[in-house]
């Protein structure tokens, strides 16, 4: 677990999540999609998603990173990958097991087999500073995990609340007891060509896009440190 001093240092740089609309041209989106679809290095996690890891310096996202640095400062990229998913992510953070000085996460929507108006990224008010995790309050059954630990009670989650989330219509894939103690800060629109920027240690999840008859979406995630 991180020390209080380490957490305080991370918190100094926290800012509200934002969406940079129309950050990528349609030709850039297509270029990124073509790279993913033509690659033979895609991996499939035991939890379902397909990923393709990419690196700064490969020339794939270097121009995007450069533009992000002009707005968010001189961060370092600790990991970046394409994701190709057919089910909505549950509540998680985007930490690293080495517990670095985590900074922003950036999500770049590239494609979905439906209307991107029906997809969002849910930002919760809560943070977790103690490693990569998925949040399943109240669960006792064991489940497969690729990298994250499962947090089954929210004692070490910051900013929990006794209030209930009143409108859960967009997160119907999440069990009610998982949401106990959590509150929604904002739902960011998952618009193709935009960039979603948020603190990587903030709890977040997808909306239930499968309920909107969308069963695949592709994008890029970039995780950073300072």
Can you say where each PLM-predicted feature lies in the sequence?
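Non-heme Fe(II)/2-oxoglutarate
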Residues: 2-93, 120, 127, 132-162
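Catalytic core of non-heme Fe(II) oxygenases with the double-stranded beta-helix
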Residues: 86-203, 207-226
């Amino acid at each position: 677990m991180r020390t209080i001093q380490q957490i305080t240092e991370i918190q100094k740089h926290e800012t509200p999540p934002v969406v940079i609309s129309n950050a990528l041209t349609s030709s850039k989106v297509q270029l990124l999609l073509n790279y993913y679809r033509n690659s033979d290095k895609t991996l499939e996690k035991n939890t379902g998603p397909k990923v393709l890891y990419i690196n700064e310096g490969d020339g794939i996202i270097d121009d995007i990173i450069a533009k992000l640095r002009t707005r968010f400062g001189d961060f370092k990229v600790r990991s970046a990958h394409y994701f190709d998913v057919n089910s909505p992510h549950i509540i998680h953070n985007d930490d690293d097991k080495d517990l670095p000085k985590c900074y922003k996460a950036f999500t770049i929507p590239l494609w979905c087999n439906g209307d991107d108006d029906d997809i969002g990224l849910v930002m919760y008010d809560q943070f977790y500073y103690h490693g990569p995790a998925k949040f399943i309050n109240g669960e006792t059954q064991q489940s497969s995990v690729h990298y994250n630990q499962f947090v089954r009670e929210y004692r070490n989650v910051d900013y929990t609340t006794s209030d209930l989330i009143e409108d859960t219509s967009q997160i119907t894939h999440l069990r009610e007891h998982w949401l106990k103690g959590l509150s929604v800060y904002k739902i960011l629109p998952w618009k193709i060509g935009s960039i979603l920027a948020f603190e990587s240690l903030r709890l977040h999840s997808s909306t239930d896009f499968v309920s909107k008859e969308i069963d695949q979406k592709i994008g890029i995630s970039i995780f950073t440190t300072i």
